[in-house]
């Protein structure tokens, strides 16, 4: 895959099953995926190989939204997700590919994310910053051990 890319790596204090579920549950995804200052609406989500999803991020200040969707290319429960993203806005052309790898480690899950094919009009550092913010929210969702 060509184009701009970001690579992220984290260790989360949660088992791979919980981290994987945060990527394939619409309610969970809406809670953690939008970066700071945005809300997310999951319009549909069919987490299976060949399945599709559609979501929108809305800027809380301006109320402007941008929508995107994609297709699930590969899913290995608790280990791997590979999917595409394509913006509805014609000014954001191309297809982005995202690979999420999960590995059980002694203290939880090692998470690696590669996002490739980012459109040239989107600064890569802004993508990276957005992912960093989202991953903080992901940790806040999956790390607590709440019994009940």
Show which residues each predicted segment covers.
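Glycine-rich portal/gate segments that line the openings of hydrophobic small-molecule binding cavities
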Residues: 41-84
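Intrinsic-disorder/low-complexity, polar/charged segments enriched in Ser/Thr/Lys/Arg/Asp/Glu/Gln
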Residues: 3-9, 16, 40, 52, ...
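Hydrophobic pocket/interface hotspot
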Residues: 19, 29, 53, 72, ...
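Beta-strand/loop substructures that line and gate deep hydrophobic ligand-binding cavities in soluble
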Residues: 82-132
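Short, highly charged C-terminal tails/helix-capping segments
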Residues: 141-148
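Structural motif
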Residues: 13, 75-77, 105-107
């Amino acid at each position: 895959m060509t184009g701009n890319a970001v690579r992220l790596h984290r260790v989360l204090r949660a088992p791979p099953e919980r981290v994987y579920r945060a990527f394939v549950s619409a309610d969970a995804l809406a809670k953690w995926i939008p970066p700071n200052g945005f809300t997310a609406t999951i319009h549909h989500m069919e987490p299976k190989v060949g399945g599709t999803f559609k979501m929108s991020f809305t800027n809380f200040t301006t109320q402007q939204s941008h929508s995107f969707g994609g297709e699930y290319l590969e899913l290995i429960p608790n280990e791997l997700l590979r999917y595409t993203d394509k913006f509805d806005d014609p000014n954001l052309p191309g297809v982005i590919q995202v690979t999420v790898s999960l590995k059980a480690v002694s203290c939880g899950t090692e998470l690696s994310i590669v996002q490739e094919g980012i459109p040239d009009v989107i600064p890569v550092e802004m993508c990276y910053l957005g992912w960093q913010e989202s991953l903080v929210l992901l940790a806040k969702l999956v790390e607590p051990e709440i019994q009940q």
